[in-house]
Amino acid sequence: LNRMGTELGQEAQQLAERIFDQAGETFNLASPKQLGPVLFDKLKLADKPKKTKTGQYSTAEDVLSTLAKNHPIVADILEWRSVQKLNNTYVSALPEDVNAHSNRVHTVYNQAVAATGRLSSNHPNLQNIPIRTPRGQQVRKAFIAKDDQHVLMAADYSQIELRIIASLSEDPSMVAAFNNNEDIHAATAAKVFGVLLEEVSREQRSQAKTVNFGIIYGVSAFGLSNQTTLSRSESKELIDMYYESYPKLKSYMSAQVDFAREQGYVATVLGRRRYLKDINSRNAIVRGAAERNAINAPIQGSAADIIKIAMLTIYDKMQQQHFKAQMLLQVHDELVFECPKSELDALTQLVKTEMEAAYSLQVPL
């Protein structure tokens, strides 16, 4: 981590110099008050720049992401922020969190903080170690087993939220794709773009993947266009084709919102409720957020319920069978264990069996 911290510091400096070259001046990159005028007064990246309540130009990540296609400086600024966050939040901070007595990093899990029922983690947050970028993966590699006789083993649910929505909506095409063990993103692309499964291109699969996960969070054509290379009209067309391909998905989502309006809550597969006080709000923005929660909460909440069942049954079986292995972490859809090398095969089989059997859906877990 110390070596990586030095490398990230150098990378941040190089990015800053490139940004200053493109801007034609130096300024404090961490100051929105200085960054805003450079982007919107000098470079004129937007016709009607968004402003904060205090009247400053907004340079929030969601605002800059929508402008990334307008000028290369935006991508460099977002990258600089990413490098700085990685360095400050993880690379520099994690060594400070090592417990002097155990020589380990310990976290605190919160059972009743996230409204969806997910566990959350803090002091430090070990559920948020980045893994989607090569740099983030390097941070994860800093977590190792206690000695060379032990290994870390991780097991996660594959696309559990999509499996849950397929099961809850009972959409025959989506259910069939999972039951046939198809790549759900490729299967979605084949249906949406009207091509054979084996003819799906990498770009088509990528776009289908974005829609698959975005639908759960109520993605709009505007939001989808910001996450892909598609225009807003192309994004709308893709979303429309998606719902045509999975019609029962759309009717399920509408039914969830209607139920929430009438009852004031939605529930997970285990019946755990989330109350939505703003579902009938006269404020369209507030009501829209509650409607998205009406769709998302049963899906995310059910995933949380299912992995908690798995954790309990795995722990019980490990105790009964006198495993020396320990369950270390839950990272939303993933469980991390430290186990003696001699127990690895047996633990792998136990964890796989119990995670798959935790709850019965219309599709396999």
Feature-to-residue mapping (PLM):
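Extended, hydrophobic alpha-helical segments in both membrane/secreted and soluble proteins
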Residues: L1, E161, H185-T188, Q207, ...
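Conserved "right-hand" nucleotidyltransferase catalytic core of DNA-directed polymerases
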Residues: L1-I131, Q149-V151, E161, A221, ...
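Interdomain boundary/hinge elements
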Residues: N2, F178-N181, H185, L238, ...
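Structured core elements
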Residues: N28, H106-V108, R118-S121, N125-P130, ...
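Hydrophobic, well-ordered secondary-structure elements that form the walls
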Residues: S31, G117, D156, A189, ...
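Conserved catalytic core of nucleic-acid polymerases
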Residues: N99, H106, A112-A114, A190-F323, ...
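Function-dense linear segments that define catalytic or interfacial modules
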Residues: Q111-L196
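C-terminal structured "cap/appendage" subdomains that terminate the fold
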Residues: K317-L365
